[in-house]
Amino acid sequence: IKPSTLNFSEAAAFQTAYLTAYVSLVRRGNLLKGENLLVHGSTGGVGMAAVQLGKYLGANVIATGTSEEKLKKTLDWGANHYVLTHKDGEVDFRNEVKDLTDGKGADVIYDPVGGDVFDHSIRCINWGGRILIVGFASGRIPTLPINMALIKGFSIVGVRAGEYGRKNLKKGVENNEAIFKICEEGHFKPYVCKEFSLEQAKESIHYLSQRKLVGKVVVT
């Protein structure tokens, strides 16, 4: 079963990424039209999905990443702006995010990265904002100075998309129906940057390790 608007390679890149984005932004983050959404890791699969869903929901989408060349692609996916998280080898994005949000900061932060990126995210979140914990691609699980949550009134929200559906089967079905519907309407389009045959599986892993990925890689 796949959305009729996608070919099989695109469909292979669809389910997990877009379900994660939907559970994160709709179910857990309660993202509202007009809010400022900061998407970390925006050039990867789950980030790409969050950018596209954020646009569909009417948010002001700010995409982040470490490569300006890759980040330019996020504008095609619906991002309003993009911001480099690292400058001269140091994490530095919070002032730029505040500038893009009239000094308020992001209302919702979608974070599959963790590490230093999370540490700086708590400095550029709006009062009453929600930080969605999607993963730790940086390799470091961050800790939180809990007084920051009190001072800025923000929430830390964990996201496990698959478990969300297993705990509530009815909502799990509704989530899948929703992402298929949005896709069929033409609002979702997974970007597959490269395809490998099954015999090239080893090469596909090497390609991922070189950090060339934009969107998704598919092994067919």
Task: Give residue spans per PLM region.
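Mid-domain Rossmann-like dinucleotide-binding core that forms the NAD(H)/NADP(H) cofactor-binding site
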Residues: A11-K87
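Local beta-strand N-terminus motif with an aromatic residue
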Residues: G34, A79, G105-A106, F188, ...
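Short glycine-centered segments of the SAM/dcSAM-binding site in methyltransferase folds
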Residues: N36, N60, V108, G129-R130, ...
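NAD(P)H cofactor-binding loop motif with strongest signal on the N-terminal glycine-rich segment
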Residues: G41-S42, V113, F136
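Adenosine-nucleotide cofactor-binding segment
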Residues: K55-V117, N168-E174
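Glycine-rich phosphate-binding loop and adjacent beta-alpha segment
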Residues: G65, T74, D116-H187
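C-terminal hydrophobic helical "lid"/dimerization subdomain
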Residues: L169-T220
